[in-house]
Amino acid sequence: MSKKFGAMILCSAAAVAAAFFAQQKGLPTQQQNQVSPKAVSMIVNLEGCVRNPYKCPADVWTNGVGNTHNVDKTKILTIDEVATDLRRNIKEAENCINTYFNGEKMNQGQYDAMVSLAFNVGCGNIKTYYSKTQGKRVATTIYRAAQAENWILMCNRIEDFNKSGGRVLKGLQNRRAKEKALCLGE
């Protein structure tokens, strides 16, 4: 972290998960998240939690648990605000997996792993990529595998998403290995 952004104000993954589940209880069923508690804990632990804004390795303003939406560069979030953003961001990832990846046909481990991936890299980035040879965005192998309901191939392609800014990052390699294992039921 660059000194010009100041020190990170970390928050407890357990506290965020507890606030997430407390908020979830009061919601109508259709508004509740579909990922398992295991997936929520995994996402929070893999992303980490920082209450103040900072720039992530992709040079994007971020706060909370990997939140990049409407980040106020002057605000320190409460745990409840972090949990609210987390619920919204997981719901967005769930919508992606349900809409484009046949999420309703996946088992819970496959679903949880794919939601974690979509949460981390964004829906558009797991659905398509820019092909230099074709000069346009084309469907990813993971997207085509999910469309064909080839769940094993889909799970095995999770590790394709191990780069940020064109560089392979050890942290992303580790995360993808965990997501792949969850997806394959290991």
From Swiss-Prot:
Disulphide linkage map: C11-C49, C49-C56
Post-translational modifications reported in the UniProt record: All the periplasmic cyteines of the inactive, membrane-associated endolysin are involved in disulfide bond. In the active soluble form, disulfide bonds are isomerized and only the catalytic cysteine remains free.
Protein location: Host cell inner membrane
Domain of life: Viruses
The protein's enzyme class: hydrolase
Family annotation (Pfam families): Phage_lysozyme (PF00959)
GO cellular component: host cell plasma membrane; membrane
Residues that span the membrane, as ranges: 1-18
Entry keyword set: Antimicrobial, Bacteriolytic enzyme, Cytolysis, Disulfide bond, Glycosidase, Host cell inner membrane, Host cell lysis by virus, Host cell membrane, Host membrane, Hydrolase, Membrane, Signal-anchor, Transmembrane, Transmembrane helix, Viral release from host cell
Active site (catalytic residues): E47, C56
Gene Ontology process terms (BP): cell wall macromolecule catabolic process; defense response to bacterium; killing of cells of another organism; peptidoglycan catabolic process
EC numbers: 3.2.1.17
Membrane topology: Single-pass type II membrane protein
Catalyzed chemical reaction(s): Hydrolysis of (1->4)-beta-linkages between N-acetylmuramic acid and N-acetyl-D-glucosamine residues in a peptidoglycan and between N-acetyl-D-glucosamine residues in chitodextrins
Gene Ontology MF term list: lysozyme activity
Domain note: The signal-anchor, which may also be an uncleaved signal sequence tethers the SAR-endolysin to the membrane until the latter is depolarized by the holin, resulting in the escape of SAR-endolysin from the membrane.
Function statement: Signal-arrest-release (SAR) endolysin with lysozyme activity that degrades host peptidoglycans and participates with the pinholin and spanin proteins in the sequential events which lead to programmed host cell lysis releasing the mature viral particles. Once the pinholin has permeabilized the host cell membrane, the SAR-endolysin is released into the periplasm where it breaks down the peptidoglycan layer.
Family listed: Belongs to the glycosyl hydrolase 24 family.
Protein name, as recorded: SAR-endolysin
Gene: lys
